[in-house]
Amino acid sequence: MERARRLAILGRLVSQTKHNPSISSPALCSPSRYVSSLSPYVCSGTNVRSDRNLNGFGSQVRTISVEALKPSDTFPRRHNSATPEEQTKMAEFVGFPNLDSLIDATVPKSIRLDSMKYSKFDEGLTESQMIAHMQDLASKNKIFKSFIGMGYYNTSVPTVILRNIMENPGWYTQYTPYQAEIAQGRLESLLNFQTMITDLTGLPMSNASLLDEGTAAAEAMAMCNNIQKGKKKTFIIASNCHPQTIDICKTRADGFDLKVVTSDLKDFDYSSGDVCGVLVQYPGTEGELLDYSEFIKNAHANGVKVVMASDLLALTILKPPGELGADIVVGSAQRFGVPMGYGGPHAAFLATSQEYKRMMPGRIIGVSVDSSGKPALRMAMQTREQHIRRDKATSNICTAQALLANMAAMFGVYHGPEGLKTIAKRVHGLAGTFASGLKKLGTVQVQDLPFFDTVKVTCADSKAIAEEAYKHKMNLRIVDKNTITVAFDETTTIEDVDTLFKVFALGKPVTFTAASIAPEVQDAIPSGLVRETPYLTHPIFNMYHTEHELLRYISKLQSKDLSLCHSMIPLGSCTMKLNATTEMMPVTWPAFADIHPFAPTEQAQGYQEMFKNLGDLLCTITGFDSFSLQPNAGAAGEYAGLMVIRAYHMARGDHHRNVCIIPVSAHGTNPASAAMCGMKIITVGTDSKGNINIEELRKAAEANKENLSALMVTYPSTHGVYEEGIDEICKIIHDNGGQVYMDGANMNAQVGLTSPGWIGADVCHLNLHKTFCIPHGGGGPGMGPIGVKKHLAPYLPSHPVVPTGGIPAPEQSQPLGTIAAAPWGSALILPISYTYIAMMGSQGITNASKIAILNANYMAKRLENHYPILFRGVNGTVAHEFIVDLRPLKTTAGIEPEDVAKRLIDYGFHGPTMSWPVPGTLMIEPTESESKAELDRFCDALISIRQEIAEIEKGNVDFNNNVIKGAPHPPQLLMADKWTKPYSREYAAYPAPWLRAAKFWPTTCRVDNVYGDRNLICTLQPPQEYEEKAEATA
């Protein structure tokens, strides 16, 4: 009866709505964001005769469309900004009748796809369906207690850090701190990280993170080669290093023509005079703790540099490598409060002496002063970096793992020196108790060498012991058939030790407990290796030890930084799009976060299923046949892709093919990546429209026909245009024996419209942190998986501990080596891209590309009467980004891109990419996630700034002392007792009306980069020193 009554009411309401326009809702059948995202047929129900006896009215009713009954939490309408009405209006403003006509005019017909269809999730999952699917995958992962070690450890992630940094969009949606005045918070945190690393390693210089420990070791190897000016071509690695580190170094050495020798320490031989450096592990991969003092003295006596891979937690109680004499120290900060995540992301580090500071890879944060003379932070020595020095750069690494470095730094701040020492001593005590108990049992033999946290055990059958541990949901490391290691960590309990006694008892009764024998256990660290030097003495590491205090410190730093929480970040070639909450949620679920990368794959079936699905989806999107998920950054993907090409040529006997052609319009990291692969780089130019000069390219390819290895091309180009001749370009390279490497930096303008494989590329890396929604994290993490055509699939990277390869797997495999420390790179953040692709569906993700192009063209049209737009396609349109030419303004008004970017801060915006790829310009990329209102607000800001520049040009304001040159204007400057500027405080602070409702304030005046590089300080200084420097520069 109740159901019948409700149906009657529903029928009456529908009938009344139809026959009484005054009560009908005009929005019901309008193509709004809500309705149109469900189905275009929601409002097209057919009229039928109603049952007169049902409701007493002789009226007609409309049926309810089945589409209207589908779930309402669809995702594309939440991600893509423009409604259908807005799309049409914006397209008309640009000069086209609709969005599709704009796309037809922009993307060359010769490479246009008819359509794209997923084999799975084609219609897109709703947000609730996606969460349910991820929960199902998570349930297929088994969380065992890990005692594997090898550089990865369970850790107790402080929840205050988890919630307020890792799960906080105010931290994870920031970009690399290029605009220092609105990035002082994370710059301070990264300076804390560098200080923590330098204190613990005993060396004065550290970078602000690298990708992982293995690649950090490879970077250190490259440094040794550079320090020796390439004259010594052998690098020796101790056999006590982690196997993944050894393999990464071997792979990397090929590009530098270095010979890598793996040897026991006692067998190191420098007699050839050809050794540039050595790598040792401290403590060793199997736990042994050695005093390297004499070893290092001997190496130095032979002109050999020493790299030491170390453990940060161990260094809180061990003599620091710097005091032992090490030249370079590398390692991972993972166990400082960052989950294992099946391999990453984690912040690695590299520390060295002041002597080698300009040879260091990665970002470095330094102390400087602002225009008022007050201390301020910024990225130091940027002239070392790949987008500036290109093939002469120290490394191809861009941003690395800033978000994870910030987590590790906060872990150090939260615990402080005493807290960290307590954790280290507890871990060491648990390992010592375990070793003592095994000796008591007598069923196995324990290594005699001292150890920190890892105990090496010799037994009759290591597999049998590991299987017994498996029954207790514990994973041990099997070294060989007679050797096992057991690594302890912060999460290990005394009860775990008792369980391990039962495992190793092999059926023998255990007559004691860990608690009962613990008082008898002696410290296993030799007196000569006990740390005596204090560390983390700065007040920052000694004042935030309660949750309230740390919460406020984190919040204080966050408040200094502009993120996507505040406004769009229109950095060209960076794709700062929405990082949706549903995409981010699975990242911190224990079922994904707490798995060791070397755990048996049957314990990670949820991950494995996701990898397979993601590989298939990426193949569909790119037109490739197989993918490797191992490269854990865009730069790593570039390197991996080129190494695949190199391996392909080598396998065919074409060892001489080493020439790489790179257009000037290619992505900035390309030359550095090619140089790392040992390639000879030939640059080709562009024409007046920004397109690759095809005839120049043809001549270069034909002239190097016998040695041509690859072309590196970015598409659309970094000039913001779809080049009409891209298919011809690919054919030229193939006809001359080369392979085409496509940089995936601009994939956001390809998805669903064309694809690298369709265009003719052989290999391409994808920036999952751009096109596929992994957040930039203030400078990392990222992922750079590579897709390849079938003929290159056998050469995709593998791993020495857990063999991997292409997804789908090729019929045969000849892997090039190992690219990253973990088998599947930074696996923990892959769910972000996976959920984005699955929720968008093929149509939604195609529309994302279209709207990104629409937004860029809309902005270019709004700005074209105020600034020259440098390059356009054949039909007058741009791709998903465009370049604004400011070069004339330097002559007419003394204004440069930096000035405009700093004034944009006063308007509440992060500046676009400055002076790249063309000096004196700004490159703008809005992405599909920004609303028309936000696009207009940014355009209004740039137009307003152009009017301010016009006042300079007219002579109405001073050429050097004006509101643009004085920008940005922080509160302390505006509230100063004296105001000497020739413009008002009000105009400096509120140049646009919307700022009065809400404004993001910079926290410092314009930072002096030159002063900072001339007076290089890259660690926290005592507070009084900051005050003295400020007074000296005032």
Swiss-Prot record:
Pfam families with a match to the protein in the record: GcvP2_C, GDC-P
GO cellular component: apoplast; chloroplast envelope; glycine cleavage complex; mitochondrion
Cofactor list: pyridoxal 5'-phosphate
InterPro entries xref list: GcvP, GDC-P_C, GDC-P_N, GDC_P, PyrdxlP-dep_Trfase, PyrdxlP-dep_Trfase_major, PyrdxlP-dep_Trfase_small
The keyword Kinase appears for this protein: no
EC numbers: 1.4.4.2
Boundaries of the annotated transit peptide in chain numbering: 1-63
NCBIfam families xref list: gcvP, PRK04366.1
Homology family: Belongs to the GcvP family.
Function statement: The glycine cleavage system catalyzes the degradation of glycine. The P protein binds the alpha-amino group of glycine through its pyridoxal phosphate cofactor; CO(2) is released and the remaining methylamine moiety is then transferred to the lipoamide cofactor of the H protein.
Protein name in the entry: Glycine dehydrogenase (decarboxylating) B, mitochondrial
Gene label: GDCSPB
